[in-house]
C-alpha cells in the first residue's frame, strides 16, 4: 500500500485536535490536516476543578466521524494527552465522578506527608520521577483520604488517554510513557511500585501492568462499520513530542514548549543519583526503552492566563510591543508554585516582583516581557543543570510544540543558553503520535527512521545566540530559586 491514513487525537490542557496524517511510503512524504479543533477548560464541580470528560469524548468522536464521512479509510488511531490526571471507573466500567484536574488545590500539603512517611530519597530511588505536588501519587492519596465514599466505588483507574481509548474500544490499557508520570511506576521493573501505591490508599487491582508504545489496544467501529485499530502510542504528549524532535546527536537537548515547558535530553539510562535528586530531575519513560531525562517548567501557562484575564486576542501585536521594551527589568521564577493556578495571574506576577524589590510590570507588554525574560533565563539555568548532570555540554537545543512559533522567546532562549536553537516542528505531539502508528503499521523501522521523515518534511528555523545581548549578561545574576516555594518544595 502506497498511502496510509492515520488519525491523531492530541489533547492538551487548553485545547484538543483531531488531526489526519497522510503518509506516502514510496516517497516518504508526510502531511497533516486539522479535522476538528475544540476547547478544553476547567470547570467547578462540587468545589473541585474538574475536566468536562464527556464533552471531550463527544468532540473526539465528532472528529473521527468527520474523517470517515470524507470517505477516507483510516488505517489506525492514536491518542495522546497531558499527564498525571486519571478517570475512575466502577465494576461495570462506568465512570465514578468527574476527573479532577492536577491544578486543583486538593493536593496541598500531601507531598510533604510522603516525604516524611516514605522518605524523599526512597521515593526517588523507586520511581526516578521529579517531585511535583500534583503528581498522581499525591492526587490518589488526596482522593482516598478526602473522599472515602467515592473511593469505595472504584474498581479501575485509567489515565486520560487510556480512558478515551477504552471508550472507543471497550479495552483497558495502561500505557507506559504516561504511567511513568504518576511517580508510581518502579523504574527497575516498569510495573507499579507496591510500596508507593500502598501509601496512596489505592488498590493495585485498579491498574494493569503498563504496556509499551506500539501495541494495538482494540478496534473502533466507525459509522460505516469498518473496524479501525486504536494504537497505544507514546500517550504522554511530551513523549510523543520528543519522538518527533529531529535531534541531531547526543549533544542535542530538547524543549517541548507549550502550556508547560519540558526541557531535557534522551538517554538509554536513567539518572537517579543524589545530584539528580537534588536538582529534581525526572526520568520519564520514552519509546524504545529510552528515558526522557528532563525538568518541568511552568511555561506559557503564565502568558495564557494573562491573555485570558486581559482579553488579549492579537498575540503578534503584543509580542512586537514586548520586543521593543528593555530586557530583564522584571524577573520572576516561573516555577514558583504561586503561579500554578492563582486567582489573578497579573496580580501574582506583580506581587512577586514587588516582594523582591524590583520594578512592577504594569502594561500588558511589560507583563509579557517579564514572562519571556524569566522563562529564557530559567531555560538557561536548567540546561546548565542538565549538562552538569550528564557531564557533557549541549551544542544545540530543539524547541518543538506551539511555543516554537514565538520568535522572540526563541531568540531570547538562544541568547540566554548560549547555543544554537532549532525551532520546529510546531505539531510535534501530533507527529510523534503518528510516528508510533506508522511503526506499528510496519511503515517505519524505528524512532530514528521517523525523525528522518520529520526532518525531510518540516522546515526548521535557526536562531544563533548573541553573546552581547542584555539577557546573556543577566544569566550569571539570575537566581531562579529566590522566590519562596518551588514546584518541588
Swiss-Prot record:
Disulfide bonds join 68-222, 353-370, 413-417. One of its GO terms (biological process) is rhamnose catabolic process. GO terms for molecular function: ATP binding; glycerol kinase activity; rhamnulokinase activity. The active site is at residue 237. Keywords: ATP-binding, Disulfide bond, Kinase, Magnesium, Nucleotide-binding, Rhamnose metabolism, Transferase. The keyword Hydrolase does not apply. Pathway: Carbohydrate degradation; L-rhamnose degradation; glycerone phosphate from L-rhamnose: step 2/3. ATP binds at residues 13-17, 259, 304, 402. It catalyses: L-rhamnulose + ATP = L-rhamnulose 1-phosphate + ADP + H(+). Involved in the catabolism of L-rhamnose (6-deoxy-L-mannose). Catalyzes the transfer of the gamma-phosphate group from ATP to the 1-hydroxyl group of L-rhamnulose to yield L-rhamnulose 1-phosphate. PANTHER family: L-RHAMNULOKINASE (PTHR10196:SF93), SUGAR KINASE (PTHR10196). This is Rhamnulokinase. It comes from Salmonella typhi.
